[in-house]
């Protein structure tokens, strides 16, 4: 036990002696305290350091002379710019320096003047100047003149019109003038107040006049009605099943833009009153509807918009088969109370003997049809010798918003009494429907037919 305790105090003494010798040999200056003398639990309040207190002489805040200062690496007297250098201005420059300065100034003054003149006469934008030529640009500011912008030529080119269409429109206008000149003043006034004036074409093998405007207009569309035709003078009728889908081709073939070599007969379309349609005096039209205006027959660049379809449409399968004839465009009447002379062959209910050429006579007054909406068509003057009777188209509305149509052979009546007797004695037409028939006012029938015709016209234009 004693042998183990003895070397410890001796070792401590040796370590202390060695540290004292090192302290004596070390140069005078700050030194770090030995680790055994530092106490980490102490903290100086002045320097916020650990290992000593404020009273300790090792605090750097008390002994500044003992603080560590970085040693200087060398002298820097010649490298620091303590006195800034001033530009040296020569008071008396030599003759060589004067010549060089004049030669440099002359091209600098000529360059901006030349560029300013080029900018005035040529109109080109000036080039970007270098930053070292600021003085020369200031002297040439007075030479710069604001130039006008180049004029913009806006030439409106007129659309090219086909010469054939122009010739056709000229002949049609001349034909209209001759027809108007031959009529009486009363008929002229009625024709001028009509809704449309369109050319009509006489088709070989079909006795029907088909007015067709060149440009479709807004407002109520025309009504499509089937008209019977006769192929011979013996009174024989050609029966062909008719469908609503076939009207597109006929409408496109009859349009005035199509090149047709057959002779064209221009006849005016007079205004149609409510009694001419046979729909009754209670036929009402929309208050916002406008009468269509006649447009010239020329090439149109702006196509009209597709009209909106109403809630009621006549499907193609609802129209029954009948005699295929020419289609007529029946314009809506301009006023319900207008009682003027009607000169339209398709509006009046007449026999072939009552239809002359141009000088037509007003038709007889007709009563309203109570239950069935019927449209009776007259014949063309070419078929006036056959003695055939006109046909009556009967439309009936079903419950599922569908319509059924049928053709009835009706004799010609010259008085309203005979017409009433025939309607009372005529049997009802058998209908191919799925439900019972509902009585509908005439104005609903007219609006539904009008919507269906407008949809068919729009589809044919798109195709």
From Swiss-Prot:
It holds the Pfam family zf-CCHC_6. Residues 74-83, 97-114, 159-170 have a biased composition (Basic and acidic residues). It comes from the Eukaryota. Signal peptide: none annotated. InterPro entries: FAM90, Znf-CCHC_6. Residues 180-198 have a biased composition (Low complexity). Residues 1-42, 67-115, 150-295, 326-365 are annotated as: Disordered. Belongs to the FAM90 family. PANTHER family: FAMILY WITH SEQUENCE SIMILARITY 90 MEMBER A11, PSEUDOGENE-RELATED, PROTEIN FAM90A1. This is Putative protein FAM90A2P. The gene is FAM90A2P.
């Amino acid at each position: 036990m004693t042998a183990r305790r003895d070397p410890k105090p001796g070792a401590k003494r040796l370590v202390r002696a060695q540290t004292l010798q090192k302290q004596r040999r070390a140069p005078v200056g700050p030194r770090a305290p030995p680790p055994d003398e530092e106490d980490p639990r102490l903290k100086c309040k002045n320097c916020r350091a650990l290992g000593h207190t404020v009273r300790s002489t090792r605090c750097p805040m008390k002994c500044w002379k003992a603080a560590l200062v970085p040693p200087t690496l060398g002298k820097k007297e010649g490298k620091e710019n303590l006195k800034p250098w001033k530009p040296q201005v020569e008071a008396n420059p030599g003759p060589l320096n004067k010549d060089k300065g004049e030669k440099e100034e002359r091209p600098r003054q000529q360059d901006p003047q030349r560029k300013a003149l080029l900018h005035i006469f040529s109109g080109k934008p000036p080039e970007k100047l270098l930053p070292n030529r600021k003085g020369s640009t200031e002297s040439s500011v007075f030479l710069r003149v604001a130039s006008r912008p180049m004029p913009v030529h806006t030439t409106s080119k007129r659309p090219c019109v086909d010469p054939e269409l122009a010739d056709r429109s000229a002949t049609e206008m001349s034909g209209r003038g001759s027809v108007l000149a031959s009529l009486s003043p009363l008929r002229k006034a009625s024709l001028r107040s009509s809704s449309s004036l369109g050319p009509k074409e006489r088709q070989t093998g079909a006795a029907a006049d088909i007015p067709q405007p060149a440009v479709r207009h807004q407002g109520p569309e025309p009504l499509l009605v089937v008209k019977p035709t006769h192929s011979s003078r013996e009174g024989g009728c050609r029966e062909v099943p008719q469908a609503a889908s076939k009207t597109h081709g006929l409408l496109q073939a009859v349009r005035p833009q199509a090149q047709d070599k057959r002779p064209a007969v221009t006849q005016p379309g007079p205004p149609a009153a409510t009694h001419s349609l046979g729909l009754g005096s209670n036929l009402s039209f929309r208050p916002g509807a406008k009468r269509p205006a006649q447009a010239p027959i020329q090439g149109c660049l702006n196509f009209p918009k597709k009209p909106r379809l109403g809630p009621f449409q006549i499907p193609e399968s609802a129209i029954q088969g009948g005699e295929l004839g020419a289609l007529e465009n029946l314009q809506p009447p301009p006023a319900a109370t207008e009682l003027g002379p009607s000169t339209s062959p398709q509006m009046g209910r007449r026999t072939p003997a009552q239809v002359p050429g141009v000088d037509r006579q007003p038709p007889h007054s007709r009563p309203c049809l109570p239950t069935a909406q019927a449209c009776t068509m007259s014949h063309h003057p070419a078929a006036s010798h056959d003695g055939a009777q006109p046909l009556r188209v009967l439309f009936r509305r079903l419950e599922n918003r569908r319509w059924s149509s049928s053709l009835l052979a009706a004799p010609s009546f010259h008085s309203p009494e005979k017409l009433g007797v025939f309607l009372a004695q005529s049997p009802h037409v058998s209908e191919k429907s799925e439900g019972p028939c509902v009585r509908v006012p005439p104005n609903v029938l007219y609006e539904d037919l009008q919507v269906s015709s407008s949809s068919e016209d729009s589809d044919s234009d798109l195709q």
